[in-house]
Amino acid sequence: MASIVFSTIGNPKGYQKVTYEIDGEKFESNVSVLALRDLLKVDKTVVILGISVADVYNCKYADYRSCKECIIQNSKNDLGISESYVVAPNVYQKFKGKPDHYFTYIYYHSLRILEKEGINEVFIDTTHGINYMGVLAKEAIQLAVSAYAAKSEKEVKVSLYNSDPVGKDVSDTVKLHEIEAIKISPLSGLKYVTYQILNKDKNFFNKIFSDSVNAIPRFATALDNGLFIYLSEKDSSLHLKRLEDDLSKDPLLTPSENEINVVYKDMKYALSHALFYVISRFSGNVDLDTLRHYAETYADKVTRAIIENEVDKIEKYQMGSERKLLGEYMKVEGKGFDKRILYAHGGLPYAGTYVYKEKDKVYVTYGDKIDEIERQI
């Protein structure tokens, strides 16, 4: 089981060596993350710094990447940590920008690390973060873990650590405490992502891409309500690719006489990426076994029971290779359906869902009814 600790650091040169303690075990270090790594036997370490640390090391501001590399190389020497570093755009003194750019950067780059390392357990250490760093880093990493757990169908444990308050001169041991511990399942990860989106003002997602103000809440609603056929058939891969392209670029660093402007992407890009990242789990033709698996993994108890009941009904009929509406088998009259019917049947309205058999598997599809389905979401 692979584990990782993400730790926010304000000034890599600003911490004295102390003795940290966790559950009676002690470790001497200038930063808490080394104690956590050693005492909790964590596999991987990621240090999160702000770009404003460039002033600590007199780094040149030619561009973000070279400035970032200067910070990393110097920080490795001061912290004694040679592993991964994330240098995020932050607001501090002459560095100007928006705090949520810090959030978005950490979300995207921590997600990439989780994917690469195949992580099952995450520790977040906010002991040395300054200003908003600890809070936003924790929220960004939780969003990344939620999206990662959902798409990869993993349960991931997340633990938050911080220390007792300390002054400049520390003579006693400093205790590190587990402030919070939760388990994020594929379902709870999915729900966390959709909650972040569906509770925002509608105009929050304006101008990300064409019609994003309507499309993003609609996709989030479909995901939240278990409309797995819609998610599989309504191609959203271009939205994900555009967001990947935007978020993978370095922030823009623009020095002037008295300040340095740092520009990246707003929080809405992180939330939108998390949504389409999870949705990318659903693609291709959906057979009944696949639909049942989606319901078992990603649907709440009520939606799961509805979908499984509808699948059980469909399995009783002898299907052919010709696509026919479910209503023809169910002997249900009427050609239309509304929002109530769509959700009451777990996304399988009899007048809007085709079924057919191919190579011993029964498939369900919206076919030419998908636009009508979309209008009801």
UniProtKB/Swiss-Prot annotation:
Its EC number is 3.1.-.-. Keywords: Antiviral defense, Endonuclease, Hydrolase, Nuclease. InterPro entries: CRISPR-assoc_Csx1_C (IPR027419), CRISPR-assoc_prot_DxTHG_CS (IPR013383), CRISPR_assoc_ribonuclease (IPR052875), CRISPR_Csx1 (IPR010171), Csx1-like_HEPN (IPR019016), Csx1_CARF (IPR053857). One of its GO terms (molecular function) is endonuclease activity. The keyword Nuclease applies. GO terms for biological process: defense response to virus. CDD domains: Csx1_III-U. The RNase activity is stimulated by cA4. It holds the Pfam family Csx1_CARF. Belongs to the CRISPR-associated Csx1 family. CRISPR (clustered regularly interspaced short palindromic repeat) is an adaptive immune system that provides protection against mobile genetic elements (viruses, transposable elements and conjugative plasmids). CRISPR clusters contain spacers, sequences complementary to antecedent mobile elements, and target invading nucleic acids. CRISPR clusters are transcribed and processed into CRISPR RNA (crRNA). Activated by cyclic tetraadenylate (cA4) to endonucleolytically degrade linear RNA; when cA4 levels decrease the RNase activity of Csx1 is abrogated. PANTHER family: CRISPR SYSTEM ENDORIBONUCLEASE CSX1 (PTHR37169:SF1), CRISPR SYSTEM ENDORIBONUCLEASE CSX1-RELATED (PTHR37169). Homodimer. This is CRISPR system endoribonuclease Csx1. It comes from Saccharolobus solfataricus (strain ATCC 35092 / DSM 1617 / JCM 11322 / P2).
